[in-house]
Amino acid sequence: MSFPLHPSLVNGITKGNPSFQGGVLKCKCSTSPVTVTLRSNVAHNHACGCSKCWKPEGALFSIVSVVPVDKLEVTANGDKLAVVDPSATILRHACTGCGVHLYGRIEKDHAFKGLDFVHTELSDEKGWQEPQFAGFVTSIIEQGFDARHIDDVRAQFESLGLESYDALNPPLMNAIAAFTAANEAKA
């Protein structure tokens, strides 16, 4: 059984170019689109099943990655951006015209502060880092997906060469745990 994981995964995974230097993300508005320029490749690219990330219509997962804050610049129509949920840890800046999330930034003290979350599918350039894993897989159940088929979803990711996790991958979870431990030691 096959499920609509994400449009960019339909034909398998296209390898990125390790020397790729970035490009422009653009919202879906046909006139006056918001553009964001990334001056580096991304890291930790992954399929995300959480309920907060922007997903293309019909997709079960988003494809999201990070870039250093100083490598991201809103380059056109930034006045159309608004934070989706000001109480969230990741402040997702979405276009008020089309609803697409252009970037997410963490302002409070967090292991990932200094990294912006982005969706490279919003770019026409080729060479972005390919997805590395699938995270928050069981979160799609909370959004209405039939739990009886979650193992089929995991198998579909496995067929693409991606490990699936119910949180982030171990290196990212280790970073969060180390950050938490260091902060608790200071208290």
Swiss-Prot record:
Cofactor detail note: Binds 2 Zn(2+) ions per subunit.
Domain CENP-V/GFA per the UniProt entry, residue ranges: 20-166
Coiled coil: none
Annotated EC: 4.4.1.22
Listed GO biological process terms: formaldehyde catabolic process
Enzyme class: lyase
PROSITE patterns per UniProt: CENP_V_GFA (PS51891)
Gene3D superfamilies on file: glutathione-dependent formaldehyde- activating enzyme (gfa)
Molecular function GO terms recorded: S-(hydroxymethyl)glutathione synthase activity; zinc ion binding
Keywords per UniProt: Lyase, Metal-binding, Zinc
NCBIfam families: formald_GSH, PRK05417.1
Family named by the database record: Belongs to the Gfa family.
HAMAP family: Formald_GSH
Annotated protein name in UniProt: Putative glutathione-dependent formaldehyde-activating enzyme
Organism the protein comes from: Verticillium alfalfae (strain VaMs.102 / ATCC MYA-4576 / FGSC 10136)
Lineage summary: Eukaryota, Fungi, Dikarya, Ascomycota, Pezizomycotina
